[in-house]
């Protein structure tokens, strides 16, 4: 990439920050002198602010989120972004706890359902056994009449 700072046409290599600092250090007023910049000649609050502004021109985004890879020209938006990850993590933890609780309720429901089904099956078996006994005894009483 070619540097568009006033009076410079150098190719900027890997050391973008160092090259920008060489221009910024020369200007006591911390003004952006990048060709065609909407803020050309405006003084920034500090040299650090000017460096952050100049990254817009170079595309340098040195502050990267280690969780998702999103990158920024300054550290403060990255910090704000990381807080969103923490909020999502906290929300996810709450959801996971709720899901685990629902899983426990479901397991308890299944155990209780099986117990009830076994009770019903046992009652059905007893009714059938009693029906057979009554039928047998009733047959025996008819023959003695």
Swiss-Prot record:
ZnF bounds (C2H2-type): 35-57, 63-85
Keywords, in A-Z order: Metal-binding, Repeat, Zinc, Zinc-finger
Gene Ontology molecular function: DNA-binding transcription factor activity, RNA polymerase II-specific; transcription cis-regulatory region binding; zinc ion binding
Keyword Ribonucleoprotein part of the UniProt annotation: no
Tree of life domain: Eukaryota
A GO CC term assigned to this protein in UniProt: nucleus
A biological process from GO: positive regulation of transcription by RNA polymerase II
Pfam families: zf-C2H2_15
Name used for this protein in its record: Zinc finger C2H2 protein ECU06_1150
